[in-house]
C-alpha cells in the first residue's frame, strides 16, 4: 500500500542543467561538492516532511529508507566527491551497497532510521538501474527483454536468463524541463502515455495523476 508520494524539482539544477555540468561545477569550485550535497539532502528532508504530513504521520515514524540514484547523484547525496565520474574511465569511488544510519548523512527521520543504498553497477550505470533490474528481473526470463530507463541519464538493459547487458547514455537536461518551452519533470499534469488510434490515427494522451485519457483536439494540433 502506498501511503503517500511526493516529488520536487532537483535543486542541483542551479549548479548545472545536466549531470556533467554539475561535476564541472564541482571541479571549478572548491566548495561545489558540499553545496550540491547540502542542496539534495535539504530537498530529501523536505520530501520526508511532505510524505509524513500526507500520511498523517511524523518524520520520526520513518524507520527505513531505500535510496537509488544515478552514480553522480548517489555519490553527491552520500557526501562523496563525484569528480572521478567526470572524466574517463568514469570510475566509481564505491560501488558497494550501503547500510547505515540515515542521520549519518544528515537525513531527518527517526534517530535510528536505517538507510539502504543499492549498489551502483559501473561507470554511469547506477543504483537506479540496479533497482530496475531487481524489480523487473529480466535475467529470469528465457525470452530476451529490453528495459529502458530514461531520465537525466538513460540506462538500457538487455537480458535473458543466460546473459545480461547494460549500458548508459546521457540524455541532457530535457527531462528536467530545461531548455524546452513546454517541458516539465515527471509530476502531476505531465503527459506520461500517448496512444494513436489505428483507424482514425487520432492521438490521445494520459497525464500523471489522472486515470482518464484525453483526446483533446489541441493535442493533435500541437503534435502536427
Name the predicted role of every residue range:
Residues 21-32, 91-119, 182-193:
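Surface-exposed acidic, glycine/proline-enriched linker/cap segments
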Residues 61-63, 125, 150-152:
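Short, basic and Ser/Thr-rich N-terminal targeting/leader segments
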Residues 45, 49, 130-134, 224:
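Predominant activation on well-ordered alpha-helical scaffold segments within soluble catalytic domains
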Residues 68, 126, 147-149:
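Alpha-helical architecture
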Residues 28, 32-43, 121-125, 215-223:
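Catalytic cores of large soluble enzymes that bind and process phosphate-bearing ligands
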Residues 4-18, 84-97, 131, 137-222:
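Glycine-rich phosphate-binding loop of actin/hexokinase-like ATP-binding domains
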Residues 2-78, 84-87, 116:
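N-terminal glycine/serine-rich phosphate-binding loop of ATP-dependent small-molecule kinases
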Residues 111-145:
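Conserved phosphate-binding catalytic cores of ATP/NTP-utilizing and phosphoryl-transfer enzymes
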Amino acid at each position: 500500500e502506498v501511503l503517500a508520494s511526493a516529488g520536487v524539482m532537483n535543486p542541483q539544477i542551479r549548479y548545472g542543467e545536466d549531470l556533467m555540468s554539475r561535476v564541472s561545477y564541482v571541479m571549478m569550485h572548491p566548495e561545489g561538492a558540499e553545496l550540491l550535497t547540502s542542496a539534495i539532502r535539504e530537498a530529501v528532508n523536505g520530501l520526508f516532511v511532505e510524505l509524513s504530513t500526507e500520511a498523517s504521520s511524523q518524520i520520526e515514524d520513518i524507520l527505513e529508507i531505500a535510496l537509488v540514484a544515478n552514480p553522480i547523484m548517489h555519490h553527491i547525496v552520500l557526501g562523496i566527491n563525484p569528480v572521478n565520474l567526470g572524466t574517463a574511465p568514469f570510475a566509481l569511488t564505491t560501488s558497494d551497497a550501503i547500510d547505515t544510519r540515515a542521520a549519518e548523512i544528515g537525513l531527518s527521520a527517526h534517530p535510528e532510521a536505517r538507510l539502504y543504498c543499492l549498489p551502483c553497477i559501473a561507470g554511469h550505470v547506477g543504483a537506479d538501474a540496479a533497482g530496475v533490474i531487481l524489480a523487473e528481473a529480466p535475467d529470469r526470463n528465457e525470452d530476451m527483454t529490453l528495459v529502458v530507463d530514461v531520465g537525466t541519464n538513460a540506462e538500457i538493459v538487455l537480458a535473458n536468463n543466460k546473459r545480461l547487458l547494460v549500458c548508459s547514455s546521457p540524455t541532457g537536461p530535457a527531462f528536467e524541463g530545461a531548455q524546452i518551452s513546454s517541458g516539465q519533470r515527471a509530476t502531476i499534469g505531465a503527459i506520461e502515455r500517448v496512444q494513436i488510434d489505428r483507424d482514425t490515427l487520432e492521438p490521445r494522451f494520459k497525464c500523471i495523476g489522472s486515470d482518464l485519457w484525453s483526446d483533446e483536439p489541441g493535442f493533435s494540433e500541437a503534435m502536427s
